[in-house]
Amino acid sequence: MQINNQTGLNEWGLFTNSGIKITADEDAEKLMYQAAHYEMVASALVVKMGHEINSEFKIGCMMAMGPTYPATPAPQDVMKAERTMQAGYWLADIQCKGKYPNWLKRYFERHHFALDITEADLNILAVGRTVDYIGFSYYASHVTKTDDYCC
């Protein structure tokens, strides 16, 4: 029996710290985004290599799913829920679409995160190295509400 479905990254998430020891004088959020970028490049290379080994392989990723819903139909709550979902699932955007979402690029600019993202990295992400499927682990749904416009 041959196994053709492979999962490269299992339940990844941005703020797992990727094993990084962060000192008090370092920007933890920036470092975690940088680590996540390297993980995305590594994942894209795994997908590429897997397809080169066997074109029948289906290589995917798996994410912990916890959808967030607005507490009310108020636009502020809807926007907060959308932003919360974006913050939790942007890695899937990169793995499926092969590029960073525009909202995240703007976030990096606003927070002055000059990450080490090279043209070669972007090419690796973009050119035929996206996952074939996404697996989900569902744990719980969440509800969010805000009194202020969040974005």
Name every feature range the model reports, one short phrase each:
Residues 1-151:
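Active-site region of glycoside hydrolase catalytic domains
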